[in-house]
Amino acid sequence: MAIAKAEILDAIANMTVLELSQLIKEMEEKFGVSAAAAAVVAAAPAAGAAAAPAEEQTEFTVMLTAVGESKVNVIKVVRAVTGLGLKEAKDLVDGAPKPVKEGIAKADAEAIQKQLAEAGATAEIK
C-alpha cells in the first residue's frame, strides 16, 4: 500500500471544503492531535518577528512609594488625579506603596509623577 505523496496531494486538491473539513476531523481523532494548535504554532514564528518591535510598553502604572512630610498635599493630588473621595484618597496614601493610577499612557504617568513629587511624595512609574 505504497501511496506516493503526489497522489495524496492530488486527492486533497480535488476535495471540496466539506470533504477537507471531514478529513481534518478524522485525522484529529485518529492521531489525537488538533489542527488548530498546529496552525497557531506554524503562525507563531511569523507573528513573533513582527511582534518584537511592538513589545514596547504602552500602559503604565504610577506607584506611590513614599508620602513625605506634606501628607495633606499628597492626598489632594491623589484626589485630583484619581477622582477618589477624601477617605479613599487618605487610605491610599496611608497604605503606600500602592498604585495611584494604572493602565495609563506614559505622558500621563509622568505628569502624575511630577504632581506627586511637587506635593512632596515619591512616586515611580512601572
Curated annotation (Swiss-Prot):
GO terms for biological process: translation. Signal peptide: none annotated. It comes from the Bacteria. Keywords: Ribonucleoprotein, Ribosomal protein. Gene3D superfamilies: 3.30.1390.10, Single helix bin. One of its GO terms (molecular function) is mRNA binding. CDD domains: Ribosomal_L7_L12. InterPro entries: Ribosomal_bL12, Ribosomal_bL12_C, Ribosomal_bL12_C/ClpS-like, Ribosomal_bL12_oligo, Ribosomal_bL12_oligo_N_sf. Pfam families: Ribosomal_L12, Ribosomal_L12_N. The keyword Lipid metabolism does not apply. GO terms for cellular component: cytosolic large ribosomal subunit. Disulfide bonds: none annotated. The keyword Ribonucleoprotein applies. Homodimer. Part of the ribosomal stalk of the 50S ribosomal subunit. Forms a multimeric L10(L12)X complex, where L10 forms an elongated spine to which 2 to 4 L12 dimers bind in a sequential fashion. Binds GTP-bound translation factors. Forms part of the ribosomal stalk which helps the ribosome interact with GTP-bound translation factors. Is thus essential for accurate translation. Belongs to the bacterial ribosomal protein bL12 family. This is Large ribosomal subunit protein bL12. The gene is rplL.
